[in-house]
Amino acid sequence: MKKIQLFTDGSCLGNPGPGGYGAVMIYNEHCKELSEGFLLTTNNRMEMLACIKALQSLTEPCEVELTTDSQYVRQGITLWIHNWKKRGWKTAAKAPVKNVDLWKALDAAQEKHKVAWHWVKGHSGHPENERCDDLARRAAENNPTQEDIGYEG
């Protein structure tokens, strides 16, 4: 299995507002960057979408070290999702899980890979995280045209 490092970040101007995601993918000496902007979304949706798009771009099963600055994403995918699924995508308070479309997509995107999820403090000088932040912010600021279909504002 190939070993890949993924770094992801999301940005939202206004929250909700225009948003974007950024991802940096490293395999051996190769580096690939992904980013995309959306008209109206939230920071959490962009954090999730960064992970989804990065994982979906892998063409074969890989061993992935995925680093995010979002505790929401890391805890959601490693801890909370198991009970959400058992409860039919409801929280402990029996409320519908927010961003369920993206949680399902993220769960499916990680399925064929062996993913180790890591958290890094945002804006702390971590080079790849800073680059992802820059990509995400620029995507949000650069007149985004994409519609976030699942966003329920």
UniProtKB/Swiss-Prot annotation:
EC number(s) reported in the record: 3.1.26.4
Record-linked Gene3D superfamilies: Ribonuclease H-like superfamily/Ribonuclease H (3.30.420.10)
Domain RNase H type-1 residue range list: 1-141
Binding site for Mg(2+) 2: 9, 133
MF terms in GO: magnesium ion binding; nucleic acid binding; RNA-DNA hybrid ribonuclease activity
Protein name: Ribonuclease H
Required co-factors: Mg(2+)
Alphabetized InterPro entries for the sequence: RNase_H (IPR050092), RNaseH-like_sf (IPR012337), RNaseH_domain (IPR002156), RNaseH_sf (IPR036397), RNaseHI (IPR022892)
Gene: rnhA
One Pfam family it belongs to: RNase_H
